[in-house]
Curated annotation (Swiss-Prot):
Residues 654-743, 808-911 form the BRCT domain. This is DNA ligase 4. Mg(2+) 1 binds at residue 331. ATP binds at residues 271-274, 278, 331, 345, 367, 427, 432, 449, 451. Disulfide bonds: none annotated. The lineage of its organism: Eukaryota, Metazoa, Chordata, Craniata, Vertebrata. Residues 610-620 are annotated as: Required for catalytic activity. GO terms for biological process: cell division; DNA biosynthetic process; double-strand break repair via classical nonhomologous end joining; immunoglobulin V(D)J recombination; nucleotide-excision repair, DNA gap filling.
Length: 911
């Protein structure tokens, strides 16, 4: 029966190879429009086949879902985890293909992140597997999309059942029935990273105009594909529904200096930013469901009914008797009943997996309500939702509580609240507009957040030593993407440290250029780390690096982090939470790094929190350490860290969608169009703004080449474009194609595209050129004083051949170098015979492309003789001394060739 139902789907008839070839074309396409075209073609063909296949059927549930769940595997919620990552896949491939464990191909798979210099695919396991599998696989697979999904379902369910033997069996079926190209995409689907270069929002928008919004309120791919199968039919009501996970509303990073403006100079709410797990609760009588911010179902942990789970039995009776249905949004926290305090997420527990005999208990801290008794509240103001929230349940301390808020009006009240949060060791504060409505998956639509680490000068920083490294993958393939850092054991007086204890792994905070430069600086010192024979100077916990560096060859990095938390993974017994590299301490020697004693002192200073200063505003004030009167040695500028600042786009009204789903990074503007103006205009046309370019950034806009722009150009990862291109787009209200005069720098793929479309001077091969464009092209051509017209002859001949102009009569002598017998003494220019017919022939030769010379030398191809034959013997004597022999012809060869519009056979005119 199941097989019969399966055969009634489109997916059971569409070859998996067709999907893979489409994905391959999408990935290889440069522009967004071309990527969309390939996806749309596949989608349209699916829909046409679907309509024909189900022509006379009613209530059809078959949809695009089987393909969509493979195209967007990161959004998959129905299928359980595969339990497979790159290393596990490598071991399975080695076993299933019976590869020699120490063989070249096995080592390639196991060490996929280590650069080899062959294909440049370091860090991309799927590509490396492709080259290993290519000689061992079918040319074309036989699996359908339905069969692939069935096998992936089998892998997921057997992983849950811990049946490794059945996992191998399913993988063997995939390997033996699919090509290397198909397996490349299968691997990416299993790892849930397709690297298509196109966002899920773009895929959704092509599928249906309502798809993004429906997915935001359901996080259900199957529901999106089934309800929106017909692109011409929209949904009248797209809103949060009971027992469907929605994407929660998010907060943007706030700039304290602009807080009053961001809140439109009206009163606002301040709440504590809780350090737990964002969770939504759906309730219908005795039935409960819990979903994380990413739509994962945690009902089994927290309880589907009043008789089960770590939370539901304790809160069920807290709800008012008239509350049958509700949807709540809040933070799941771990509560210590002995100390009556909430635990921070960095400590050793996982709220989603707490066991019953734990000393901690689950507490749900609620800050919003989206539905009560079937009444949807998403379009109500936050003030109204708060009023309703207070009437839904009776708070139970340590089990279910309402997040307390205070009403504020000024920046100083925000500063006081932030300083209080620092004193209480809290994560930060939230700022919310009372009139804001709930917008799923939207960031900064009336909600803002402030954490101490967002504000420069409030955090203690650590100077620690790099002792190990990890090869990157994806865009960081082939370079060190993360570093293992350590602190020193305090040495005896007068000596340098010799033993280092690992503390943390860090990789964020660096640009690609900085990572590359740092890796280059240390490149010659890296050594493979052997777990069985580790270096005596570096003591590790369970976290081991892939390569290590002798401390004396390394550098110190300055690290900023939120706090120091316990950890068994590092030798120090603790690690850093949210670490990022601030800078490389070139001013310090390797032995001047932090010691274990320094670390313990810092750890005990504020219960591990690294925010130990208060925020002050005005005059020469600066962040001050709590309970200390001495000012810090170095002044620190107060404000949001520059690269985290985002433009204030709250008052921007969208006027066009030409930049929809396009990400820009504006580095600088022009005098007439400064950076903020360009960013506002981009937002008006539907674009996104980032302050640092990433893998999804379409291009970097630069009005001048400052140091940041030069670094981006050096990285060769991004296209850098003049603001003039943006202004042209704004003027025409269209996505104007790039032209050479718009470009400051082109990444390799763009250069390749332009080479196919334009010549080296920027003139298009295919698009008609107007007068202004031609003037612009000519103005960019540098004058060359070195080349004479004669020296240009070879270049002109090549051009004529390329464009098939070489058959023109005006080009017939182009490749000939001719000496005419115009001189009484050969090569003596003072003996020229004036007024002869040969002088006219010289002009005719030049007109028809020949190079006419006045000196008989190596390289001459023809000598032309007139009526006077007295110097023929001299010419023949000259010819015997030349490596390349020239021909001596009658002048009639020129006349006859011109008269007949083609070169005549030379042998008839030889002398």
């Amino acid at each position: 029966m199941a097989a019969s139902q399966t055969s009634q789907t489109v997916a059971s008839h569409v070859p998996f190879a067709d999907l893979c070839s489409t994905l391959e074309r999408i990935q290889k396409s440069k522009g967004r429009a071309e990527k969309i075209r390939h996806f749309r073609e596949f989608l349209d063909s699916w829909r046409k086949f679907h309509d024909a296949f189900h022509k006379n059927q009613k209530d059809v549930t078959d949809s695009f879902y089987p393909a969509m769940r493979l195209i967007l595997p990161q959004l998959e919620r129905e299928r359980m985890a595969y339990g497979i990552k790159e290393t596990m896949l490598a071991k399975l491939y080695i076993e299933l293909l019976n590869l020699p464990r120490d063989g070249k191909d096995a080592l390639k798979l196991l060490n996929y992140r280590t650069p080899t210099g062959t294909h440049g695919d370091a860090g991309d396991f799927a590509m490396i597997a492709y080259f290993v599998l290519k000689p061992r696989c079918l040319q074309k697979g036989s699996l359908t999309i339905q069969q692939v999904n069935d096998l992936l379902d089998s892998i997921a369910s057997n992983n849950s059942a811990k049946r490794k033997d059945l996992i191998k069996k399913s993988l063997l079926q995939l390997i033996t029935q699919s090509s290397a190209l198909e397996q490349k995409w299968l691997i990416r689907m299993i790892i849930k990273d397709l690297k298509l270069g196109v966002s899920q929002q773009t895929i959704f928008s092509v599928f249906h105009s309502d798809a993004v919004e429906l997915h935001n309120v359901t996080t259900d791919l199957e529901k999106v594909c089934r309800q929106l199968h017909d692109p011409s039919v929209g949904l009248s009501d797209i809103s949060i529904t009971l027992f469907s996970a929605f994407k929660p509303m998010l907060a943007a990073i706030a700039d304290i200096e602009h807080i009053e403006k961001d809140m439109k100079h009206q009163s606002f709410y301040i709440e504590t930013k809780l350090d737990g797990e964002r969770m939504q609760m759906h309730k219908d009588g005795d039935v409960y469901k819990y979903f994380s911010r990413n739509g994962y179902n945690y009902t089994d942990q927290f309880g589907a009914s009043p008789t089960e789970g770590s939370l539901t039995p304790f809160i069920h009776n807290a709800f008012k008797t008239d509350i049958q249905i509700c949807i709540l949004d809040g933070e799941m926290m771990a509560y210590n009943p002995n100390t009556q305090t909430f635990m921070q997420k960095g400590t050793k527990f996982d709220i989603k997996r707490m066991v019953e005999d734990s000393d901690l208990q689950t507490c749900y801290c609620v800050f919003d309500v989206l539905m009560v008794n079937n009444k949807k509240l998403g379009h109500e103001t936050l003030r109204k939702r708060y009023e309703i929230l207070s009437s839904i349940f009776t708070p139970i301390p340590g089990r279910i509580e309402i997040v307390q808020k205070t009403q504020a009006h000024t920046k100083n009240e925000v500063i006081d609240a932030l300083n209080e949060a620092i004193d209480k060791r809290e994560e930060g504060i939230m700022i919310k507009q009372p009139l804001s409505i709930y917008k799923p998956d939207k960031r900064g639509e009336g909600w803002l957040k402030i954490k101490p680490e967002y504000v420069s000068g409030l955090m203690d920083e650590l100077d620690i030593l790099i002792v190990g490294g990890y090869w990157g993958k994806g865009s960081r393939g082939g370079m060190m993407s993360h570093f293992l850092c350590a602190v020193a054991e305090k040495p005896p007086p007068g000596e340098k440290p010799s033993v280092f204890h690992t503390l943390s792994r860090v990789g964020s905070g660096c640009t690609m250029k900085e990572l590359y430069d740092l890796g280059l600086k240390l490149a010659k010192y890296w050594k493979p780390f052997h777990k069985k024979a580790p270096p005596s100077s570096i003591l590790c916990g369970t976290e081991k690096p892939e390569v290590y560096i002798e401390p004396c060859n390394s550098v110190i990095v300055q690290i900023k982090a939120a706090e120091i938390v316990p950890s068994d993974m590092y030798k120090t017994g603790c690690t850093l939470r949210f670490p990022r590299i601030e800078k490389i301490r070139d001013d310090k020697e390797w032995h001047e790094c932090m010691t274990l004693d320094d670390l313990e002192q810092l750890r005990g200073k504020a219960s591990g929190k690294l925010a130990s200063k208060h925020f002050y505003v005005g005059g020469d004030d600066e962040p001050q350490e709590k309970k200390r009167k001495a000012a810090p040695k170095m002044k620190k500028v107060i404000g949001i860290i520059e690269h985290l600042k985002a433009p204030n786009l709250t008052n921007v009204n969208k006027i066009s969608n030409i930049f929809e789903d396009v990400e820009f990074c504006v580095m600088s503007g022009t005098d007439s169009q400064p950076k903020p103006d360009l960013e506002n205009r981009i937002a008006e046309f539907g674009g996104y703004i980032v302050q640092n370019p990433g893998p999804d950034t379409y291009c970097v806009i630069a009005g001048s080449k400052n140091i940041r722009v030069k670094n981006i150009i050096l990285s060769n990862k991004h296209d850098v474009v003049k603001p003039a291109w943006l202004l042209e787009c704004f003027k025409t209200k269209s996505f104007v194609p790039w032209q050479p005069h718009f470009m400051i720098h082109m990444c390799p793929s763009t250069k390749e595209h332009f080479a196919r479309e334009y010549d080296c001077y920027g003139d298009s091969y295919f698009v008609d050129t107007d007068l202004n464009q031609l003037k612009e092209v000519f103005s960019g051509i540098k004058n060359s004083n070195e080349q004479t017209p004669e020296e240009m002859a070879s270049l002109i001949a090549d051009l004529e051949y390329r464009y098939s102009w070489d058959c023109s009569p005006l080009s017939m002598f182009r490749r000939h170098t001719v000496y005419l017998d115009l001189y009484a003494v050969i090569n003596d220019l003072s003996t020229k015979n004036e007024g002869t017919r040969l002088a006219i022939k010289a002009l005719e030769l030049r007109f028809h492309g020949a190079k006419v010379v006045s000196c008989l030398a190596e390289g001459v191809s023809h000598v032309i003789i007139g009526e006077d034959h007295s110097r023929i013997a001299d010419f023949k004597a000259f010819r015997r001394t030349f490596k390349r022999k020239f021909k001596i012809l009658k002048e009639s060869w020129i006349t006859d060739s011109i008269d007949k519009c083609e070169l005549q056979e030379e042998n008839q005119y030889l002398i």
